[in-house]
Structures are given as C-alpha cells and as structure tokens.
C-alpha cells in the first residue's frame, strides 16, 4: 500500500510540475528556466512548511507523509528533499557537513550532467 501512495502522489506531483513548466514557458518564454526555478523554490517552501509543522505541532501518519512528502513533492521536485536534508544537517549543528552536502550535490550533479552529455556526444 505504501508504494501505491508514493506512486499516486508522484504522478500528481509530476503532473503539477509539467503544468507549472508549461505555464511559465508561455508567460515568460524559454530563455531562462523560470518554471524549474519556481518549482524548486516553491517545493522547498512547501517541504519546509510540512516538515516544520510535523516537527513542532505533532506527527502525521506515515501513509500521509509518504503520499505528500515522498510522492507529491518528490514528483514535483527533488530539490525540496535536498533542501530539507541540508537544513537537517545544519539544524543538528553539522554546518560544515551541510555546506559540503549542498555544494557537493550541486557541483557534482552539474558535472555529472556534462559528463553524460559528453559521453553521448562521443558515442554518437
């Protein structure tokens, strides 16, 4: 049942992500990735609201967390999970590790993308 909750939530999140990208492309053009920018920021805000509420006001049932946080927000943007992981490291006082995680994730993700592009160019 848990996998089904994540699956359905992920489908909803991905659908909203696509809609936001299309709306932003029509409204602002495609010269800057406004859609992705908005998705990453808004997903992180929503993740912070939910995580903060659960931490300070009480816990929610595991199925609800799986559906909303892993499913919907995971399908909408993985940046929200990245932001939460960074904040949790920082909140635990592991500031250096939080910085290493944040910088390393961004740098290595971009380097990985370029490596994938270069490999495909080389093979084709």
UniProtKB/Swiss-Prot annotation:
Cited Pfam families: CRCB
Lipid bilayer topology: Multi-pass membrane protein
Record-linked InterPro entries: FluC
BP GO terms, sorted: cellular detoxification of fluoride
Signal peptide: none
Transmembrane segments: 36-56, 66-86, 100-120
Location of the protein in the cell: Cell inner membrane
Activity regulation info: Na(+) is not transported, but it plays an essential structural role and its presence is essential for fluoride channel function.
Keywords carried by this UniProt record: Cell inner membrane, Cell membrane, Ion channel, Ion transport, Membrane, Metal-binding, Sodium, Transmembrane, Transmembrane helix, Transport
Catalytic activity: fluoride(in) = fluoride(out)
GO molecular function terms attached to this record: fluoride channel activity; metal ion binding
Binding site for Na(+): 74, 77
GO CC, alphabetical: plasma membrane
Functional note: Fluoride-specific ion channel. Important for reducing fluoride concentration in the cell, thus reducing its toxicity.
Family, per entry: Belongs to the fluoride channel Fluc/FEX (TC 1.A.43) family.
Protein's name according to its UniProt entry: Fluoride-specific ion channel FluC 2
Species for this entry: Nitrobacter hamburgensis (strain DSM 10229 / NCIMB 13809 / X14)
């Amino acid at each position: 049942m848990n996998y089904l909750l994540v699956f359905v939530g992920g489908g909803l999140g991905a659908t909203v992500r696509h809609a936001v990208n299309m709306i932003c492309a029509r409204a602002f053009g495609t010269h800057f990735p406004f859609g992705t920018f908005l998705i990453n920021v808004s997903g992180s805000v929503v993740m912070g609201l939910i995580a903060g509420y659960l931490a300070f006001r009480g816990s929610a049932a595991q199925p609800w967390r799986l559906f909303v946080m892993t499913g919907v927000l995971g399908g909408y943007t993985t940046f929200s999970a990245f932001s939460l992981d960074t904040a949790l490291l920082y909140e635990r006082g592991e500031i250096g590790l939080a910085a290493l995680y944040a910088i390393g994730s961004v740098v290595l993700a971009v380097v990985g993308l370029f490596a994938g592009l270069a490999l495909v160019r080389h093979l084709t």
